[in-house]
């Protein structure tokens, strides 16, 4: 294979000639240090290469080595609990090799350890017919994850050979498939190009909610398994803490956290917290179901794009095994800024605010890889990839290109409001600007499995919050005393919704995670208060008298979110009894 020659270097962009037979998105090794790069444009025999490592010290006329392959990652046992860089190089292996806290340029480390032996249990036998995606055996990778070994997509035929149960490395052939006369070995590990979505049989409608334990996300703006969500917000509004809560407490089987161009100390927080935290669904350490991709702001700009694709490809691989996976990306704005930087260096025509004109199509390609699917292969199974991405608009301007284009492709919008954050209301999600297109799809699940009145209670809360915002404008002008009694009640109910339900402390042991049943019990208390109080107000009892009659009951309801554990929900029965007793006494007074 002919080697190219460097003609020009412009930061992470390298131009090489003598590359006539090169292909788009082919991986090349640049210069004497053999830095990893990817061809992003070809003009004649010149190739424009985005280099995923620091190019300082490279000179014109140095060689460019072609590999003939696209940027691919290794998929197999050994991914869970690992921390990778943006090119799927394991950081712990690099540290052992270099004895340094920094990643050396041009370093080559296998993504999956070649020496570790995994206990493989076959699920098929010689002579069975298999196709791409068929499960041929399992490896118990962690106590939480049963790693299902799949036939690579596009391989099909009859099994000529299957190994017996035992311990094997990821490079040992565990089966041989006779594919039209060719013998194709199947190993525990397979490779897949990151820019190509993995195939599936059929895309399905997402109907089951992805429970996160965060009340405003689960109830007001729910996301379904296989859904897409964006969390835009200015600096300091709580994007990272919200995403970390998602990664920690969500009901996904596998969580992939991609730190794309964010500060290194945020990834350090993750690495410090995850080993000590327990998964609320299983009681096991969270790291047993998590993969971290660390591509921090001080790493090369071009690798941000690779890290996003590496993350979504790993998510698709676990989806193909029949698991619900969650990809958390923080943040896609940094990826878009990398595209802008490279586009400028390649002298492309800029579009709005200097971003390249193909920004919308890149974002669309990324979000379209989410979804709930019927997978290829046997036995029949269903999996999902849910994508939640932070967007960091400068100054909190939601009209800037990355936020406005992202809004076109996501079905859930969780906008963070800096004024709420400054008022210490966390999560600072603005309940007036946010939306979810999955409410109708997931309402049936909530009504069936949690509370038959869930949809009714949720809609009452949303209506109250919208009406309260309208009334606040009037209160600013003429004061609260001029309001009708029913409007005063709306202000009181809205205060209860915000304090008892929407506010949630991510650092409180009890309040950090609310089970669906606990969320429904808090909603029920608010719903009962609003229903009974509305009837009394209609009978002429002032809102102030109703609130005064409650005494310490309303503060007790507000405190219950951090006082009552998820397994002590019978304590809500007592609160309900107290609430109903107060209203019965008020009704007796009104009747006399």
From Swiss-Prot:
The keyword Cytoplasm belongs to this UniProt entry's keyword annotation: no
Tell me how this protein assembles. Answer: Has multiple subunits with at least A(3), B(3), C, D, E, F, H, I and proteolipid K(x).
Could you say which protein family the record assigns here?
Belongs to the ATPase alpha/beta chains family.
Q: Where in the cell is it found?
A: Cell membrane
Q: What is its main location?
A: membrane
SMART domains, per database record: AAA
* Record's keyword annotation contains ATP-binding: yes
So where does ATP get bound?
233-240
Q: Which GO terms describe its molecular function?
A: ATP binding; ATP hydrolysis activity; proton-transporting ATP synthase activity, rotational mechanism; proton-transporting ATPase activity, rotational mechanism
What name is this protein filed under? A-type ATP synthase subunit A
Query: Which PANTHER family does this entry report, sorted A to Z?
Result: H(+)-TRANSPORTING TWO-SECTOR ATPASE (PTHR43607:SF1), V-TYPE PROTON ATPASE CATALYTIC SUBUNIT A (PTHR43607)
Instruction: Tell me what organism the protein belongs to.
Output: Saccharolobus solfataricus (strain ATCC 35092 / DSM 1617 / JCM 11322 / P2) (Sulfolobus solfataricus)
EC number of this enzyme: 7.1.2.2
Any single GO CC term annotated in Swiss-Prot or TrEMBL for this entry: proton-transporting two-sector ATPase complex, catalytic domain
Q: Please provide the record's keywords in A-Z order.
A: ATP synthesis, ATP-binding, Cell membrane, Hydrogen ion transport, Ion transport, Membrane, Nucleotide-binding, Translocase, Transport
Name one matching Pfam family: ATP-synt_VA_C
Protein purpose: Component of the A-type ATP synthase that produces ATP from ADP in the presence of a proton gradient across the membrane. The A chain is the catalytic subunit.
The record's section on InterPro entries has:
AAA+_ATPase (IPR003593), ATP-synt_VA_C (IPR055190), ATP-synth_a_Xtn (IPR031686), ATP_synth_asu-like_sf (IPR023366), ATP_synth_asu_arc (IPR005726), ATPase_F1/V1/A1_a/bsu_N (IPR004100), ATPase_F1/V1/A1_a/bsu_N_sf (IPR036121), ATPase_F1/V1/A1_a/bsu_nucl-bd (IPR000194)
GO biological process assignments: proton motive force-driven plasma membrane ATP synthesis; proton transmembrane transport
The reaction(s) annotated as catalysed by this protein in its Swiss-Prot or TrEMBL entry are: ATP + H2O + 4 H(+)(in) = ADP + phosphate + 5 H(+)(out)
Describe its membrane topology: Peripheral membrane protein
């Amino acid at each position: 294979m002919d080697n190219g020659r460097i003609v020009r270097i412009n930061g992470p962009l390298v131009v090489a000639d003598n590359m006539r037979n090169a292909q788009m998105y082919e991986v090349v090794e640049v210069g004497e240090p053999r830095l990893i790069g990817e061809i992003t444009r070809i003009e004649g025999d010149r190739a424009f290469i985005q280099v995923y490592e620091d190019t300082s010290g490279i000179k014109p006329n140095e060689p460019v080595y072609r590999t003939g392959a696209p940027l691919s990652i290794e998929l197999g046992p050994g991914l869970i609990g690992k921390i990778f860089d943006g090119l799927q190089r394991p950081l712990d292996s690099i540290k052992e090799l270099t004895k340094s806290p920094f990643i050396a340029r041009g370093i080559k480390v296998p993504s999956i350890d070649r020496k570790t032996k995994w206990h493989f249990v076959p699920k098929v036998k010689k002579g069975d017919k298999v196709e791409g995606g068929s499960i041929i055996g399992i490896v118990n990778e962690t106590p939480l994850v049963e790693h299902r070994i799949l036939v690579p997509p596009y391989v099909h035929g009859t099994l000529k050979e299957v190994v017996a149960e035992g311990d094997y490395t990821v490079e040992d052939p565990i089966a041989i498939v006779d594919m039209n006369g060719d013998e194709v070995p199947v190993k525990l590990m397979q490779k897949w190009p990151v820019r190509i979505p993995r195939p599936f049989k059929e895309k399905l409608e997402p109907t089951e909610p992805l429970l996160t334990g965060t009340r405003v996300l689960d109830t007001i703006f729910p996301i379904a398994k296989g859904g897409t969500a964006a969390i835009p917000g200015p600096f300091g509004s709580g994007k990272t803490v919200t995403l970390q809560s998602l990664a920690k407490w969500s009901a996904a089987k596998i969580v992939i956290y991609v730190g794309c161009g964010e500060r290194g100390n945020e990834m350090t927080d993750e690495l410090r917290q995850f080993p000590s935290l327990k998964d609320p669904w299983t009681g096991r350490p969270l790291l047993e179901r998590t993969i971290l991709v660390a591509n921090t702001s001080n790493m090369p700009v071009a690798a941000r794009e690779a890290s996003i694709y590496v993350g979504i490809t790993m998510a698709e691989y676990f989806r193909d095994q029949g698991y619900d996976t969650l990809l958390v990306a923080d943040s896609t704005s940094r990826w878009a800024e990398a595209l802008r930087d490279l586009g400028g260096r390649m002298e492309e025509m800029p579009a709005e605010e200097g971003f390249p004109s193909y920004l919308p199509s890149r974002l669309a390609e990324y979000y379209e890889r989410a979804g709930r699917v019927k997978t290829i292969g046997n036995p029949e199974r269903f999996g999902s990839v849910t994508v939640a991405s932070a967007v960091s608009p400068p100054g909190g301007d939601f009209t800037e290109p990355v936020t406005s284009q992202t809004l076109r492709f996501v079905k859930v919008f969780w906008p963070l409001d800096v004024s709420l954050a400054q008022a210490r209301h966390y999560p600072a999600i603005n309940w007036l600007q946010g939306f979810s297109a999955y409410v109708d799809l997931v309402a049936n699940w909530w009504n069936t499995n949690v509370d038959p009145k869930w949809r009714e209670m949720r809609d009452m809360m949303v209506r109250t919050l919208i009406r309260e915002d309208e009334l606040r404008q009037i209160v600013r002008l003429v004061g609260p005393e001029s309001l009708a009694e029913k409007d005063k009640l709306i202000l009181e109910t809205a205060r209860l919704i915000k304090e008892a339900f929407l506010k949630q402390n991510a650092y409180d042991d009890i309040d950090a995670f609310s089970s669906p049943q606990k969320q429904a019990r808090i909603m029920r208390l608010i719903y009962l208060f609003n229903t009974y109080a509305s009837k009394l107000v209609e009978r002429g009892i002032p809102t102030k008298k109703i609130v005064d009659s409650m005494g310490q009951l309303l503060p007790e309801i507000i405190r219950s979110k951090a006082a009552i554990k998820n397994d002590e929900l019978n304590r809500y029965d007592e609160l309900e009894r107290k609430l109903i007793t107060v209203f019965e006494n008020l009704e007796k007074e009104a009747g006399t």
